[in-house]
């Protein structure tokens, strides 16, 4: 465990922010830097079958140290950080023995407050790693990367019985492309766990069904003084579209298993406007209904427009709820829960109000629930992780490997 914090701080010092709307994978050069560093560290650690694909998927194998028909299992994390907030020049703060109250983030007015983030009340006495208020931290998912690397070092340096352990580090998870170029057959695991969750004890096997909705609106611009009966204001049409979307079904008004419509961006002029929504729902039927609703709204608002003016709507599914694939293999969850209990952690089964690479991988034939990392408040300046939570994640990874070996012997 002595190098866990050192690894994490090294990884977050590299800017690996991914970029949406880019064809190449990985979408940024910074991700390659971390992937090459990890490849070198895996080689130095003595892992075998190390490959780094042209699409930035890094895979490696820790050979089994016991005989028997033991299934090969995998652990996966992503190297990119969210494009939602800057990941450049990350300057972590280490708060040892947190005693409660506000934590100043850097030298400005930014604070990490238990008033806004009550979970801090549960973390008294722990070591917190925060931002300086200018960037995100990158615990999502460099905490997971550091935890997997540290677990490998523990397994390599101690006589803990384990079968073949596969590890993978993927790019562009935050922009939904991480798993698209993942070769499940080459990876060679019967099942895997992404290490990409939140607080200690989280074990997730349900996630949103997800789709993106891109709307292009073409209007007609003329001088406002002579516009009657001629102007078609694309911005006004955009406003009408959003007014038809249920206001009480937005991210800021939903929780738990509730789905939502989210207007992520909107830009334009009188002549042309663009809107980008994301749709999320755990229930497949409700998910399909939400997509139909968006089409109906576009038809309603676009009815009767001049032939040269139009509303174009494109819906693209991003990923689906992995529950249906994971529950076919209950032992995957049983082992993870037992590993947590053995590490004195109460498993907390909760739905992911988002997605992970594991969701896509589960539909590609690799059942892949999600383990906690010990991090909180991802994608922004209030992101932080606890050192104790990271250490617990390492213990759980190691224990999963050990329990899987016992199961196969």
UniProtKB/Swiss-Prot annotation:
| Cofactors | Zn(2+)
Q: Which GO terms describe its molecular function?
A: metallopeptidase activity; tripeptide aminopeptidase activity; zinc ion binding
Its gene name is: pepT
Its biological purpose is as follows: Cleaves the N-terminal amino acid of tripeptides.
Q: Which residues bind Zn(2+) 2?
A: 140, 174, 379
Give the EC number(s) under which this enzyme is classified: 3.4.11.4
Q: What GO CC annotations are associated with the protein? A: cytosol
> Could you identify this protein by its name?
Peptidase T
Any note on cofactor binding? Binds 2 Zn(2+) ions per subunit.
Q: Where is the active site?
A: 80, 173
Intrachain disulfide bonds: none
Q: Which residues bind Zn(2+) 1?
A: 78, 140, 196
Q: Which GO terms describe its biological process?
A: peptide catabolic process; proteolysis
- Cross-referenced PANTHER family: PEPTIDASE T
**What InterPro entries does UniProt report for this protein, alphabetically?**
ArgE/DapE_CS, Bact_exopeptidase_dim_dom, Peptidase_M20, Peptidase_M20_dimer, Peptidase_M20B
Give the main EC class. hydrolase
The family line of this record is: Belongs to the peptidase M20B family.
Query: What SUPFAM superfamilies would the database entry show?
Result: Bacterial exopeptidase dimerisation domain, Zn-dependent exopeptidases
Localization, per the record, is: Cytoplasm
Which keywords accompany this UniProt record? Answer: Aminopeptidase, Cytoplasm, Hydrolase, Metal-binding, Metalloprotease, Protease, Zinc
Q: Name the chemical reaction catalysed here.
A: Release of the N-terminal residue from a tripeptide
